[in-house]
Amino acid sequence: MTMHVEVGPDSTAPPHSSGIKVIIIGLGIGGLAAAIECHRKGHSVIAFDKAQELKPVGDGIALAHNAVRVIEKWGKGTVGQELGRLSSRLNTTVIYDQTGRFIAEDKLDGFKAGEGHLLPRGELSQVMYKHAKSLGIDMRLASEVDEYWEDENSAGVIVDGEKITADCVVACDGVNSKARRHIIGYEPELRSSGSCVFRGWMTTEEPLVGSHWLLSHTDQADQVKVFAGDGVHVLLSTIQHGKMVFWLCTHKDNDCYDRKKEAPPTPEVDGMIHLIRDWPMRGQIESTIRKTLAKNVMHYPLLIREALSNWRSKGGRMVIIGDAAHPFLPVSGQGAAQAIEDAAVLAITLHLAGKEEVPLALHALEKIRLPRTALLQRSSLELERFWLNIDWPEVEKCPELLTIPRPKWIHGHDCQTHAYTEFAKVVSAIQMREEYHPLGGPRDSTNGESLLALLRQDT
């Protein structure tokens, strides 16, 4: 009996109907999304993570509309509804200078209710993990991969001495990926972006004395406030109607990465306060972040890699996605979203190519996804540098320069419809060994046009 399987961006397939077995390494946001999306398209999934358990910890994470439109299809909409209950209720980000003078309002397009989410990172991963378990996906924790291998017909891993065989291996093990070298054959250079970041979070179960300026009116909407100075900017945000406060401070530091090789930066609030010691707004900001427990403070260099030219192994049956392939700076607000886009497109290209053409599916995934992520990587670095080298006379003329560009080609992107639309064109380009020109996105940069200008293209 032939099983009819609907094909389209909203379609699902019966479990295990494709005959394709996928091994997923890493159960962060990207890995969980890959497991769920592959299951939805009828692929058999076995996933591994070295963690003993997936703990519901972490600070805030932004999930933009281009990712939420994927998640909203899970569990007949129930997963999206649950995230909506956990998410902040955002209206605007208010931007000030270091004296507290109002500069501009950012309308947060793509993150408002019904569009995107700002929520605790740990709770997002827990909701995704719970949904994956409800689907019966085989997920194995406390599992360390010892070896990666592939041949003409299969690929797999050796985990704790056991050889696991599949049609392909998908590594989603983060920016410090151990799989990456085995898959693409080398370890790309990691270098400093020229800046470091302090991050911290706290709950408001105990009253935060001196924080009324941030917590007032959170019964109506959560608050996001940004303070911009010379070489330093600070963001404070409430989450879940003021139940949690998340903050970060990004600052110039060209030597932070080199010092980290000798000793990690000290993750102390004092270090962050020192950066704003001369700010008129210091007292107000300090009154809130002083409540952060030491265990909830991080301080680390913001590292970058040049966009990779290839995500696949030589044999074509192993691939890296998410932060393992394209780490983003926090200012982009797209790290999680791009990992989820990768996951959705992976499941679709495998579905369309079929079991006999798995290497072609992974090649098509790379062709569709790599140009978009490479452009976003480069533009996020330019955006970060703009914020740390603010041209105040220009901002005086146009305060909107300090708002974060959120063009339709990023936040309005439907990665699933795009994959179905482009798949045949991509396959033809691969088979004919021709250059593939992606549909959609910004115009190519010409006449010295900056990447930041491309970000402001609302196409």
UniProtKB/Swiss-Prot annotation:
Indicate whether Flavoprotein appears among the record's keywords: yes
Name the needed cofactors: FAD
Q: Which GO terms describe its molecular function?
A: FAD binding; monooxygenase activity
Catalyses:
asperlicin C + NADPH + O2 + H(+) = asperlicin E + NADP(+) + H2O; asperlicin C + NADH + O2 + H(+) = asperlicin E + NAD(+) + H2O
Query: EC number(s)?
Result: 1.14.13.216
Indicate the residues that form the catalytic site. 199
* Keyword NAD carried by entry: yes
Q: Which residues make up the binding site for FAD?
A: 49, 62, 121, 323, 336
Print the keywords alphabetically: FAD, Flavoprotein, Monooxygenase, NAD, NADP, Oxidoreductase
**PANTHER family associated with the record:** MONOOXYGENASE, MONOOXYGENASE, PUTATIVE (AFU_ORTHOLOGUE AFUA_6G12060)-RELATED
Instruction: Indicate the family of this protein.
Output: Belongs to the paxM FAD-dependent monooxygenase family.
Sum up the protein's function in the record's words: Catalyzes the conversion of asperlicin A to form asperlicin E, a potent cholecystokinin receptor CCK(A) antagonist.
Q: What is this protein called?
A: Asperlicin C monooxygenase
Q: Which organism was this protein described from?
A: Petromyces alliaceus (Aspergillus alliaceus)
The gene that this protein is the product of is: aspB
